[in-house]
A protein has these predicted regions:
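Alpha-helical transmembrane segments and their membrane-interface junctions
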Residues: 105-114, 175-180
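Short, flexible, glycine-rich and Lys/Arg-enriched loop motifs at helix boundaries
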Residues: 147-151
């Protein structure tokens, strides 16, 4: 989030390009997660079930980390005058693609949706939804920061935002575990 905000503060187009790059990387991770989980469901179903359980635990863990993290993130902008759109795109793409936790996150989420009788439409929907939602979130964030001047709003509330997201992950993990035990 901070990278997109920093790029958005350089220029609106920088923010948009960073958002698109990030979204494409998220789409790739989503695609690889779906392909990997499909292979597991068809060839190693017991491992798939174990992975579902581990994924639920991971979501709970992410929620706990988000809730207990106290450090405020720094929103300082470096090189504010640099307006290289290609670099903004590459920064957005790189920060997402180099984060292996994203793959684990998608594996955790998608393992709850996939089964032996999946079809290509569901898989396409999972991948495209992740990519589009990610891009749109960061595009909206860019608009909020550049047009409406919400940088200080996010900065002052990053602690609260992190807590809310953490609680949401914990709630999702509890619901998924209840559904798995049924």
């Amino acid at each position: 989030m901070l990278l997109v905000i920093n790029n958005a503060l350089k220029s609106k187009l920088n923010g948009f390009m960073s958002a698109i790059g990030h979204g494409l990387a998220i789409g790739l991770y989503a695609l690889f997660s779906v392909i990997g989980l499909e292979l597991l469901t068809h060839n190693y179903y017991n491992i798939f079930i174990i992975l579902k359980i581990l994924s639920i635990i991971f979501l709970f863990y992410i929620g706990m980390i988000s809730i207990t993290k106290n450090k405020k993130e720094n929103l300082l902008v470096k090189d504010n005058n640099v307006k290289n759109y290609r670099i903004a795109f590459l920064e957005g793409f790189t920060i997402a693609i180099l984060n292996p936790k994203i793959f684990i996150f998608f594996t955790a989420i998608y393992s709850q949706f996939l089964s032996l009788d999946n079809n290509i439409v569901l898989n396409f929907t999972l991948v495209s939804t992740a990519m589009i939602v990610d891009m749109m979130w960061y595009i909206i964030l860019t608009i909020l920061v550049t047009v409406l001047g919400f940088k200080n709003f996010f900065y002052r509330r990053i602690f609260l935002i992190r807590k809310i997201v953490g609680l949401l992950f914990i709630l999702i993990s509890v619901v998924l575990m209840i559904n798995l035990l049924k």
